[in-house]
Amino acid sequence: MNTHFTAAVVGGGPAGLAAALALSAAGCDVLLAAPPHRAHGGAPDNRTAALFAGSIALLKNLDAWERIASHSAPITGIRIIDDTGGLLRAPELVFTAAEIDLDAFGWNVPNSALTAGLIEVAQRTGSRVRLHSTAGIVKAEIGASAVTLTTHEGATFTAGLVVGADGRGSLCRQAAGIGTRSWTYAQSAIATSFQHGRPHRNLSTEFHRPAGPFTTVPLKGLASSLVWVERPDEAQRLAALDEPAFRAVLEERLTGLLGPVGEITSRAVFPLSGLTAEAFGRNRVALVGEAGHVIPPIGAQGLNLGLRDAATLADCVADARAAEQDVGSAAVLDAYSARRRIDVTSRIATVDVLNRSLISALGPVHLARGLGLVALKTLGPLRRIAVREGLAPASADADLLHPDGARRLSERASGAARHSAA
């Protein structure tokens, strides 16, 4: 049994799965070490993720989207409603995908369908991706030419490059000696999904409220997912309500936009926090997803960032393979870290400023936010630039984020693109 791989991915969430498949597309033999996927049984995962166009392109390039699309709902418009109660109330603002010549901004995808679709592809890639079920990696030892991973069950594997996709408490990040900066907000989010009487018309609606955003995102049919940000004590109180009482409060907050509220799925409450790693790659370890950055669930940026990590890492590894370089070398990881820094830093800053502008008690802050929304409503070119940058930042230019990216990445890894240009 082979125990050495070009790359090993630790963690089986969507970002880790995408990283394993992306590295496979770049020509690597990949170990994916993750807990077993429970397609049946256990508590259902009712979470969803709004994925933008670049993330959908990545899934298409990985041959996963056709397995996921039927479970997902398009987001063709984004509506922002100022519900802060301030003296200057911004007008209702609606962005449409047609403004920037798209059919949809993105798709709202159930996490369970996303994970299952990616795993199905990984299982069909033959020997290129090897799935190893484990309760966890307990040790990662950095060597001169490889990293040795030890599983909870005692198995050992080596890899020239390890991808830490093991979450905010990442053992891989700690083993690589990468520090972090973290912070918390005096807020918690309630996450759930619900059925409703009126069509959502594929509009995502975000109420800007003093305690934080209250956001609905369309699901298939007469249903939407909800992320409701509140003060921690209020979030716990709301989550503890029985279903009829919670339904009544939810209908009040929605102001009739979606009609009567029907069945509500289980509610989860989690505190809002942020984290960013001081580097996204070092000592043969590359970080993807929440191992490298944690962002509040505002503006649907978190998982999209993680998928862009996976696509960018594949680019850097493909370049190394074409040049016959060590894929875990400092040069490769420095290049990856540099390419991800602008995107991650700008997303975190944007979400942080927006969130703090809502909960701030300072009048000038509310005035600035309101004037910004007015400008976006009245200035078409500015609005289109803002929307395009929010969905597909110029700094995120990896092959797999674009149509025909799988072919381009394969050529990059083989050096064909370089030879044809020479």
Question: Where do the PLM segments sit?
Answer:
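Conserved FAD-binding catalytic core of PHBH/FMO-like flavoproteins
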Residues: L59, A146-R267, L272
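N-terminal FAD cofactor-binding segment of flavoenzymes
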Residues: D45-G85
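FAD/FMN-dependent oxidoreductases across multiple families
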Residues: Q236-G328
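Conserved N-terminal helical subregion
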Residues: T3-H4, H71-A175, W183-S188, E243, ...
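Glycine-rich FAD pyrophosphate-binding loop
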Residues: S24-R47
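Generic enzyme active-site microenvironment
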Residues: L32-A33, G164, V288
